[in-house]
C-alpha cells in the first residue's frame, strides 16, 4: 500500500491505494481508503501527509506480521494489569458497517469538518453511543467509561461527549434527512406508500417538571407520576424507521401527528409533484384536524375508530349482523361501506365548521380479539369487586382498573343522601361486552380491498414493537440527561440505534429479535493475550450471518491488533460483490 497525493484545484487529495498485477502481468492499483483533502486535517495533525504516510507504513507492517503465526508466551508469574482494559468488543464492527455504509454518517460529518474545527470527533462519539445503546445500554458516562473496549480509538474526554450532544442536536434534522437519502442511494427507494405513525412517552427520574422545557407531567403509558417526554415515530412500509419528533410530556397524542409530518417533509399541500402517502395510525390520532389536514395535503389515511365511543349511527351499523361475510370456521367476519365522515375545521375567520370527507368504513369481528377482551374485562371486574369489598374506592374511583364500580348512595327517609354506596355497574359491563371482538377502521382509500385495509392497519404492530425495543432492549428510559438539547440528542442516538437494528434484522431475514442480535454481537469479545493479540471464544450461526451480511469474517479465534483495525477500516468502505 502507498499514499496517493492527487492535486485537485490547488488542494492535495489523499487516498490509500494498493498495487497489484493482473493475470496478464500488467500493474494496476485499487483504492483501499479515501481520506480526503489534506488541509481538512491540519487542525488535527500538524503535518497530515506525514501522518498518513506513517499510517500506511504501519498498516504495511501489520499486514506483513499478519502473514506469520501468532506465538504468545506466558509466564506463570504474570499478573493481571488492573490499569489496562483486557477486552475488545469486536461485535461493534457489524452495526458500524450500517452506520457508515448504509446511513453514510461519516460522510455527513466529513462534509462539515472544514466548516468547523473540532477538538473532538462527533462522528466517533456518536458511533460509540449508538453501539453502547445496542449492546450495553446505560448513561453517557457509562458509554464513555467503556470506550477502551470499543474497537476504534476514542481519544476524547467525557466533557467532549456532552459537548457533542449539543452539536448532534443542532444537526439532528439534517442528519436524519441525510440518512434517509443515503439509505435510498444504497438500497433503492424507500417503501413510503404507507407510513405508520404512533406516539409513546419516556419517563425521567426527577420530582419536578421543567418550568420551560420538555419534561412535563402527562398521561404516562406506564402509569408513572414522573415527568415525561413524548416521541412520535414514523416507520416506512418495510418497518424501517423513517423519522421521529420529540414533544413535551404534556402534549396530547392527537396534536403530534401534523408537526411530525411537517418535520418529516410529508406535508405538501398543492404540490402536484409530491409523492402521495397513506398514514396508518391508531384511534388516538383519529381527529378532525388530522383527517382534514391529511386530506387537504393530498395524502391518504387508514385510522382505527373506537366502536364503544363511536356515534350511535356508526356503532349500530358495526354491531348489526346484517352485511357481514364470515370465514368457514366462523372465527372472523367483515363488512364495509362507503360513507361521509363529518370533521370539524376552523376557518381563517376562526369559526368552526362541519365538513364531510368521503371514506370507506370497514368493520370486522375476530374471535381472538373477542376472547382477549372478555379475559381482560374479567380482570377489571374482579378489581372493581375487590375495591368495593375492601372499601378502597375513595382513592381508586378515578382509575380505569375499577371503572365498573359506580356510586349509588342510599337516600334516607329525610330525603338526604346517605354515605357512599359503591356497587358494580352491570349496565356498563353489558354495554362494553356488546362491543367485544369488534374493530372499525376508516380509510380514505375507497377502492382498496377490505382485507388490504385490515392488513395495512395490522402493520401497526411493527411500530409497537419498535417502541418496545427502544424501552426494553435499548433502555431509552429513564433518561439520564437533563438539558433539553442533550435530551433531544439522546433520542437521536436511540433512533439511529433502532434504524441500525432494523437493518440488521432485515439482512438476516427477520428471523431474530432485537434482543437476540444484541446478545450475539455483545458476545463477540476478544480477550487480550499479549500486547498485540486477542483471543475470541464466541461464535454462533447468528454471528456468522451478521458478519456475512456486512462482508467480514468474525470466525477467527485469534486476531492481532492490526487485523482488528483492518476489519474496522473495511466496514467503512462500500461492500463489493
Predicted feature locations:
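Secondary-structure transition/capping motifs at alpha-helix termini
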Residues: 23-24, 150-156, 188-189, 237-240, ...
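Basic, amphipathic alpha-helical segments enriched in Lys/Arg and hydrophobic/aromatic residues
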Residues: 36, 483-504
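An anionic, glycine-rich sequence signature occurring as long contiguous blocks
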Residues: 227-229, 246, 300, 305-456, ...
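Active-site beta-loop-alpha junctions of metal-dependent nucleic acid enzymes
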Residues: 245-268
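Short amphipathic alpha-helical "interface-anchor" segments enriched in bulky aromatics
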Residues: 453-480
